[in-house]
Amino acid sequence: MTRRLRVHNGVEDDLFEAFSYYADAAPDQIDRLYNLFVDAVTKRIPQAPNAFAPLFKHYRHIYLRPFRYYVAYRTTDEAIDILAVRHGMENPNAVEAEISGRTFE
């Protein structure tokens, strides 16, 4: 089954925040983080969307190793929804509240 891939507009802001951190801390790592994101979203998740660990009810995530960032997504029969890029040390309750509010309607 081929599912439609949708990326929430908020993901751009999430990536910008991560890139801003690395612009100061390790600018040579920005391309690496971006490439891992693209690989996760365009290859790894679509190939096996249920293979990655649950994050919250109805949501899964894949870490962009070796970074501490992960991609949060959900799947339906019709689509794979990429909802956020978050740092693994963020407050889980705050992350869940924000992610659950991100819709495509």
Curated annotation (Swiss-Prot):
Q: Which InterPro entries match?
A: RelE/ParE_toxin, RelE/ParE_toxin_dom_sf, TA_system_RelE-like_toxin
Record GO biological process: symbiont-mediated perturbation of host process
Q: Which Gene3D superfamilies match?
A: RelE-like
Q: Which UniProt keywords apply?
A: Toxin-antitoxin system
A Pfam family annotated for this UniProt entry: ParE_toxin
What protein family does this chain belong to? Belongs to the RelE toxin family.
* Function, as annotated: Toxic component of a type II toxin-antitoxin (TA) system. Upon expression in E.coli inhibits cell growth and colony formation. Its toxic effect is neutralized by coexpression with cognate antitoxin ParD2.
- What is the protein named? Toxin ParE2
Its lineage reads:
Bacteria, Bacillati, Actinomycetota, Actinomycetes, Mycobacteriales
State which gene encodes it. Answer: parE2
